[in-house]
Amino acid sequence: MKHVPIVVLDFGSQYTQIIARKLREAGVYSEIVPYNEPIGDIVARTPKGIILSGGPASVYAVDAYHPDTTIFELGLPILGICYGMQLISQHFGGSVIPASHHEYGKAKLQFEVENPIFKDTQDGQIVWMSHGDRVENIPAGFEKIATSENSPFAAIADINRNIYAFQFHPEVYHSQEGSKLLKNFAKHICGCESTWNMGSFAKEQIKQIQDKVGNKKVLCAVSGGVDSSVVATLLAEAIGEQVIPVFVDNGLLRANEREQVETMFKSRGVNLITVDASETFLSKLAGVTDPEKKRKIIGETFIEVFDVEAKKHSGIEFLAQGTLYTDVIESVSVKGPSKTIKSHHNVGGLPDWMKFELIEPLREIFKDEVRALGLELGLPKSMISRHPFPGPGLAIRIMGEVNKPDLELLRKADVIMLDVLHSTGYYDKTWQAFTVLLNVKSVGVMGDNRTYDNTVCVRIVDATDGMTATFAHIPHEILETISRRIINEVDGINRVVYDISSKPPATIEWE
């Protein structure tokens, strides 16, 4: 089945893919393309509407991103968000100027008129502003449909041409009813229906895998996390014993993780192959302190290990990975100019010397969609609800060089923190929780003795997709329990701190 999409043009906002996720959450399929996508390629997708994303630049900048203006002649409904609004205003003859008061943060949206894009939402709702330029005069044919304290044109529309524009970001978590606004655009302005769901996605992926693989075999990288487990299950559904699932113990796993992974797959009747490559990984990481180099080394070593394992089996032509949409957007601008944050170990394709063709069935879906897909495939909720764990493992939760003593220290602290969260019911209330070994020592007193030991940081965040996150407001008594237990039970740690940074500006992981 071909899904008729809403096409999102990416002008460089780190929030672009959240727009797509919010639409899919409403059952509306969406695709993201670069801002300069050829008009013919856009038309070939037969979209029901177009959204122009936000972006980091000014429309008047020398290197400003501009789309093919033919999009405005297609007769399709269009929604511009922030930078997208300024592009629309500029194109149709309005004026855009630097704002006298930059508007960053929450604002109250006041409706000026009734409009279907506001259907079932509250006047006075809180929205998220993040802009330096603003529309001074709106183009002919447009009317203001909402304002805020610092934005006389917080939302505008040309009703006759079905062109809408928001100065705020409806897609981000802080916009109270932003999801409804996007849903209203898709359903009431574009006429989309709710046909996108993980049941149909699973069927489509199974057929695509079968068509692509034929009678060949697929080597599947398994970590035991949600993503790789869903990939392995999807492959097993599609091609049965043609999938060869391989779990690599890289020495960077959490406490008891190898045993848990092996038990889980055995209970599902999957013949999991375990490769102990911990010494290989740790030897290659010796002396390396740069986080980007650590990620690259781990990614390259994974590929080498899989290549060795593949040679033990005949007929393998494919390698499967659990790459997600968020991995892609944070690694490389494959769909637009969004700025690179960090590389991911499973993104960027395979080296030229490797003979495998890559299969990434989750590459275009988000974490919440992966969990829904896992439940659709019959995986247990206990596994589906596990917190995300990065491919590079504990290597990027140790600041500086990675070695066995520090890994053991971090594992012990992590076990205690997770135990407290599970026992208090906060594990399932948060998106991700972990500890970071800072490799910063400080003076302390234990008993009558002076100590000079390590500092551990506790990082707990709330999120829905990992693209944005806020630090979790854990009760102080629970944080106190975590701190007291770690300091009392783990030799070598005398200080525990709590990370209260949100994303952005910080990333969730420290490296």
From Swiss-Prot:
The UniProt record lists the keyword Mitochondrion: no
CDD domains: GATase1_GMP_Synthase, GMP_synthase_C
Recorded metabolic or biological pathway in which this protein acts: Purine metabolism; GMP biosynthesis; GMP from XMP (L-Gln route): step 1/1
GO MF entry, a single one: ATP binding
Active-site residues per Swiss-Prot or TrEMBL entry: C82 (nucleophile), H169, E171
Signal found in the keyword field: no
Chain positions recorded as ATP binding sites: S223, G224, G225, V226, D227, S228, S229
Domain GMPS ATP-PPase: 196-386
Ranges of residues in domain Glutamine amidotransferase type-1: 5-195
Pfam families given in the database record: GATase, GMP_synt_C, NAD_synthase
Catalytic class of the enzyme: ligase
Catalytic activity, reaction form: XMP + L-glutamine + ATP + H2O = GMP + L-glutamate + AMP + diphosphate + 2 H(+)
EC number: 6.3.5.2
Keyword set, alphabetical order: ATP-binding, Glutamine amidotransferase, GMP biosynthesis, Ligase, Nucleotide-binding, Purine biosynthesis
Any one annotated GO CC term: cytosol
Subunit structure of this chain's protein: Homodimer.
Function according to Swiss-Prot or TrEMBL: Catalyzes the synthesis of GMP from XMP.
Name used for this protein in its record: GMP synthase [glutamine-hydrolyzing]
